[in-house]
Design a protein with these regions (language model features):
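Glycine/serine-rich phosphate-binding loop and adjoining beta1-alpha1 elements at the start
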Residues: 65-151
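A structured beta-alpha segment of the ubiquitous adenosine-cofactor-binding alpha/beta core
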Residues: 42-57, 64-65, 199-217, 221-238
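An N-terminal-biased, well-structured beta-alpha scaffold segment characteristic
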Residues: 1, 23-94
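Glycine-rich phosphate/diphosphate-binding loop of Rossmann-like nucleotide-binding domains
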Residues: 1, 23, 27-36, 134-219
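Short amphipathic, helix-prone segments within low-complexity/disordered or flexible regions
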Residues: 2, 6-20, 24-28
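Rossmann-fold NAD(P) dinucleotide-binding segment
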Residues: 61-86, 212-213, 226-246
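Rossmann-fold NAD(P)-binding glycine/threonine-rich loop
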Residues: 86-107, 235-275
């Protein structure tokens, strides 16, 4: 007896899943790319975010709300997305001001969201691609060749994203170190991988010591917005070998990496201090 509308902005909802949700509860409105299979399943395609926020009672998306979206939210609207309230107090205030009912996707269950797993795995693969000399990398082979050692990789953060990246890189033969602030997480990963990975507490001094010998860094840390006590400073990046790779999966402005700036799919790489 419950009727509402449901929208996905960036999450990949499969056509069968869309069909099931339509039959049970919802009319699905999707605002990414048009797909006949979604239409066949009963999804409604729209062209603008304004249409979505203006008509949907339940809004689900992947990333945090952008400031341009704050004014589109309506009182009583239910929203479900990654909010990361500790890192985005201004977003929390906007949700309170608009009087919406908000659920933090990242805290909805202990196993995290599939998009976090996808980001970790794809980030690892993008890092390996960037290591190729044709992309400016040092050309080191992930698992090593003959008498040549494999890549040394540092993963910042042992959460869902970091664990997904670790699964890919360990399977391919990389020498991986995971840094996290939770010793319980590190112990669990050590046991899971039968002591075949290195772990350490994530702080600047520990990272500084191993960075010169590290071939690739993956940042999987959600950093408090505005905190400029970077885990990796520009000066630390200078200690890495030219052609080394940093993959910032967290993608936070003023995040854990001082040298971060946004990129596009068309031009995803840039060079800072030779890295």
């Amino acid at each position: 007896g419950f009727s509402t509308t449901f929208m996905t902005v960036a999450a990949r909802l499969s056509p069968p899943s869309a069909s099931v949700r339509i039959r049970i509860l919802f009319t699905v409105v999707r605002a990414v790319s048009a797909d006949e299979k979604y239409a066949e399943a009963g999804a409604v395609m729209v062209d603008t975010a304004e249409e979505i926020y203006g008509t949907c009672d339940f809004v689900a998306k992947v990333k945090e709300f952008e400031p341009s979206e704050y004014g589109l939210l309506r009182e009583g609207q239910i929203v479900f997305t990654c909010i990361h309230p500790a890192a985005h107090p201004e977003e929390v205030q906007a949700l309170l001001d608009q009087k919406v009912i908000a659920f933090t996707a990242e805290d909805s269950h202990r196993y995290g969201s599939p998009n976090c797993e996808a980001a970790g795995k794809q980030g690892a693969l993008m890092g390996l691609d960037s290591m190729l000399t044709i992309h400016g990398g040092k050309g080191k082979f992930v698992s090593g060749l003959g008498a040549a050692p494999g890549m040394k990789v540092l993963i910042l953060g042992g959460g869902v994203v970091g664990q997904a990246a670790l699964a890919v890189l360990h399977a391919l033969g990389a020498w991986v170190t995971v840094a996290d602030i939770n010793i319980g997480t590190l112990r669990s990963l050590q046991n899971q991988y039968r002591q075949n990975i290195n772990t350490m507490i994530a702080n600047r001094e520990n990272i500084r010591q191993i960075l010169p010998e590290t071939d690739m860094v993956l940042n999987c840390v959600k950093w408090p917005k505005g905190n400029t006590q970077y885990l990796i400073t520009r000066e630390m990046v200078r200690t890495m070998e030219p052609g080394s790779v940093i993959v910032d999966i967290s993608n936070d402005e003023q995040g854990a990496l001082e040298t971060f700036h946004e990129t596009t799919h068309e031009n995803p790489r840039y060079v800072e201090e030779g890295v």
